Amino acid sequence: MTIQSKISSCRNIMSEVQSNKSKVDAGSERAKANNTFFDVYNSFLLPTLTAYTIVKQNTEYTFPQEAVNKLKECLDYVTKTLDSKQVLNVSTFRVNSVYARDKISEAWVAHANEITREILDDLGVFKLVSDNKLEIVRLSTAIKGISTWPVTKKQFDDCTLALEVARNLLKTMKFDSEIETFLRKVRDKQATLQDLSDPIIKWIRDNNFEGSIQLSIKT
């Protein structure tokens, strides 16, 4: 059974079981173990399963096998627990669920940061000369939204739309290499008077950017 099938089966069974858990005496040791089991599932495992599924549905990203194996281990534990109707070693289930969440979230955030780094970098440059800086901020925020965990379907949808708009905007950004290098220095607060070559000065004046460009004065 694939992990996607395991996730679907597990969530369906858990939904049914949770609706009946109140039938167990609330004060019993069994109830305490059950409550801990459900708390761990709802707080740690379910958000991970949901976000994992969303990522797989919206990207071709492959999570590290170690993290996937730990997630499978948690799913197998849930299935076994529900089949046996007895909660055992719930503390281990908690540790494994937290571990799976941490490893999967760490891997995804690192990947999302990497695949959005270049366009966010370009938007940072474009913002320096844009007439609509708030729009650039909005687009950047939407794109950064997928670099979170647990990531949601809405964040993916917002990011996809923002990427399309951003790419179209960036097509209008036509600078030669000297100007682009200069703007990146300005963005990083590393531009100095020495960077003001004659072509750069002419470009600034021709575009009325005198009030937009800030330089660093190094002593």
Describe each model-derived feature in a short phrase.
Residues 214-219:
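C-terminal edge-of-domain segments
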